[in-house]
Regions:
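PAPS-dependent sulfotransferases, especially Golgi type II membrane carbohydrate sulfotransferases
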Residues: 1-15, 52, 91-94, 154-157, ...
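ATP-binding Walker
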Residues: 22
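A structural motif corresponding to the C-terminal end of an alpha-helix
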Residues: 107-110, 183-193
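Conserved phosphate-donor/acceptor-positioning beta-strand/loop module used by diverse small-molecule
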Residues: 119-120, 130-155
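P-loop (Walker A) phosphate-binding loop of NTP-binding proteins
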Residues: 19
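PAPS-dependent sulfation machinery
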Residues: 38-118, 123-124, 248-249, 253, ...
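Phosphate-binding beta-loop-alpha motif at adenosine-nucleotide cofactor sites
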Residues: 114-121, 189-216
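A conserved segment at the C-terminal end of the G1
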Residues: 25-36
């Protein structure tokens, strides 16, 4: 299979990023309900093959191991043959990124769509790299109250440790939320970036979706409010922790159920200066 020039065929490329358990799958399901949008299950393409640390990228070798990783990931989501679009080997991280984007382009074209939406929360760490290759890429940052994310991440990592690098400690969950919040805050007011607050989305879904669609360049569709069928399509069978996305919208919190009063007080103390108010734009 030979790579093809797809820039004219693809109208828009969108990444949904944030911290796990923030509502990224919900946002994906809603936006992917539009008839022009293609959205696969989480690809993990970038986070599984490209170093998170910037200083490691210039000397990174992309070869047999990385190609095999992408092959496995493609097989899980049903696009095995597209691994042929990868370079045989390269030291050029930008070239590797181009090939990964081209693979998603080809998925989108195959499904007769012209807008694609990829949702792997930790692709948050690759925003600048992706933008350097495709400057018009749009990023949707999903944010949720720290107490709720920390409780959910702490809980789900104990129920499904094999998918979350083992059970996460309270301090680790706090660290991840705060770190990712700092990264997202760097892009406030930037072109092609929109920040979606989970609590607002649940309370005022149409308003928030319209705002998000405007940044993407997508017409709002009422289909986005009937998203539960799409929620099943964008998740793999083993991702049982995402089942809540096929239920009606609801504000829910595990904070008081998961943590003791002492733990709750500790978490609230650590988060006392962290507010999502800066994202209210």
């Amino acid at each position: 299979m030979n790579p093809v020039h797809t820039s004219s065929a693809i109208k828009k490329r969108v990444f949904i990023v944030g911290t796990a358990r923030s509502g990224t799958t919900l946002v994906q399901s809603m936006l992917a309900s539009h008839t022009s949008v293609f959205s696969p299950p989480e690809t993990h393409f970038f986070r599984r093959t490209i170093p998170k640390r910037l200083w490691m990228r210039p000397s990174k070798w992309y070869g047999k191991s990385e190609i095999e990783t992408i092959r496995r990931l493609l097989k899980k989501i049903g696009y095995n043959d597209l691994s042929a679009l990868l370079p045989r080997f390269t030291f050029d991280t930008s070239k590797w990124v181009e090939s990964l984007i081209n693979i998603i382009d080809q998925m989108c074209i195959r499904e007769n769509k012209n807008i694609w939406l990829e949702k792997t929360p930790l692709h948050l760490y690759y925003i600048d790299l992706i933008t350097s290759v495709e400057p018009e890429t749009v990023f949707v940052h999903v944010l949720r109250r720290g107490e709720d994310v920390i409780a959910s991440l702490y809980d789900v990592s104990r129920k499904y440790p094999e998918y979350f690098s083992g059970p996460q400690s309270i301090n680790r969950c706090i660290y991840l939320w705060k770190k990712n919040l700092r990264i997202s805050s760097k892009y406030i007011g930037k072109n092609n970036h929109v920040h979606v607050l989970y609590e607002k989305l649940v309370s005022r879904p149409e308003e928030i979706l319209r705002k998000t669609c405007k940044v993407i360049g997508l017409d709002f569709s009422t289909d986005m409010l009937n998203y539960t069928h799409k929620a099943q399509a964008v998740q793999l069978t083993e991702e049982k922790w995402k089942l809540s996305n096929i239920k009606p919208l609801q504000k829910s919190s595990k904070f008081k159920k998961v943590f003791t009063k002492k733990q709750q007080a500790y978490i609230r103390h650590i988060l006392r200066n962290d507010s999502l108010s800066r994202f209210n734009n």
